[in-house]
Each structure stands twice: as structure tokens, then as C-alpha cells.
Design a protein with these regions (language model features):
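Conserved small/polar residues in nucleotide/adenosyl-binding loops
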Residues: 168-169
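Residue-level detector of extended alpha-helical repeat arrays and alpha-solenoid scaffolds
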Residues: 38, 72-73, 106, 140
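Non-membrane alpha-helical segments in proteins
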Residues: 8, 12, 35-48, 61-62, ...
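N-terminal alpha-helical scaffold/docking segments in eukaryotic complex subunits
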Residues: 1-26
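Amphipathic alpha-helical scaffolding segments comprising HEAT/armadillo-like alpha-solenoid repeats
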Residues: 18-28, 50-61, 85-96, 119-130, ...
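Hydrophobic, well-structured mid-protein blocks that either form specific transmembrane helices
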Residues: 55-101, 105
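A mid-sequence, solvent-exposed acidic-amphipathic segment
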Residues: 103-132
Length: 169
């Protein structure tokens, strides 16, 4: 069910909810009926002030509820600050999602890798791309998207990866 609330309006509302003392009640409500409610919960998880351990707990509870690319991708974008505060901890945290058989769990893991397209992680990202195998459309498109971002930031390394591979994702 979709209400039709635009993303910029949801972001404004998410910032307001994240500032409230009772934001946890909103995030922990799992009986959402509308796309926008789920999207809003993901945004609040990314925006609310909390320790990294608590945020990862909320992420773990939220990820299984992701059922479309938009919620996944916006949620991952909202986690940018969390990644900056605990880059290696979050790196370890997302590893199990990268081998999940579930389409949107693996997409979550791959889209989270976008935060790691840097000198320190580029080789690991391309190695992961090399072993990636999943039949689901949205997982495959996330991997193709990640490789395109790698190519923009590290064209030589990414081209070396792409040349010997018949990449069809």
C-alpha cells in the first residue's frame, strides 16, 4: 500500500521523529501497512542519535523487512554517518548479508559496499564482485551498480577486473 508521500517530505518527517525521545517506539513498530512507514522507519534508524551497537541491532531487525529496491537504497544512504563512525565494525557487520540467499538482504549488503569504494577496500570489493553469484534481478543490478561506481573512482583497477571476465550481471 502506497500513500504517495514524496521522499523529500519523508526526510523532513524522519528528522523530526529522530529528534524525539520516543523515536525507538516508532522504529520498533513492525506492523506497518504502508510503504512510506517502512521507508520512514529506515530513515529514522539512520538519523537518530544512538551508539553503533544499538544502530546495528535496529539494522538487523529492519533488513528482513526490506522488500523493494527503493527502501533498500534509501536506507543504505541514510547509514552513511554510521559507517563513518565505525567503518571496520560495519564492514564486518555487513559480510553475512553479502552471501544471503534473500534478494533484498544481499542487495542491502551490496549497496552498503558503496560506502567502501575507497583505496583501502577497492581490491576487496572487486574480489567480492568476482565471486558474486545470485539469480535475483535486484541483487544483480546492485552488483552492476557497485562495479560502475568502482569504475568511476578507480578506472584502471576496475578495467583490469572487467577485461578478463565475461561480466553479464
Amino acid at each position: 500500500n502506497i500513500l504517495g508521500v514524496r521522499i523529500p517530505q519523508l526526510r523532513i518527517l524522519a528528522k523530526e521523529i529522530a529528534k524525539r525521545d520516543n523515536w525507538r517506539m516508532f522504529v520498533e513498530a513492525t506492523d506497518t501497512k504502508f510503504y512510506e512507514e517502512t521507508m520512514l522507519q529506515g530513515m529514522v534508524i539512520g538519523l537518530a542519535k544512538m551508539e553503533l551497537d544499538e544502530r546495528m541491532k535496529h539494522i538487523s531487525m529492519f533488513v528482513p523487512r526490506i522488500d523493494n529496491w527503493a527502501v533498500c537504497d534509501i536506507f543504505c544512504g541514510e547509514l552513511k554517518t554510521a559507517v563513518k563512525k565505525g567503518k571496520e565494525t560495519v564492514w564486518q557487520f555487513i559480510q553475512p548479508y553479502l552471501i544471503s540467499p534473500k534478494e533484498f538482504e544481499i542487495r542491502f549488503g551490496i549497496v552498503m559496499l558503496f560506502h567502501y569504494v575507497d583505496e583501502e577496500h577497492i581490491d576487496a570489493l572487486l574480489a567480492h564482485a568476482d565471486t558474486f553469484s545470485h539469480d535475483a534481478y535486484y541483487a544483480r543490478m546492485a552488483m552492476a551498480w557497485m562495479i560502475s561506481i568502482c569504475f568511476i573512482k578507480f578506472p584502471e583497477k576496475t578495467m583490469k577486473y572487467l577485461k578478463p571476465v565475461s561480466y553479464t550481471h
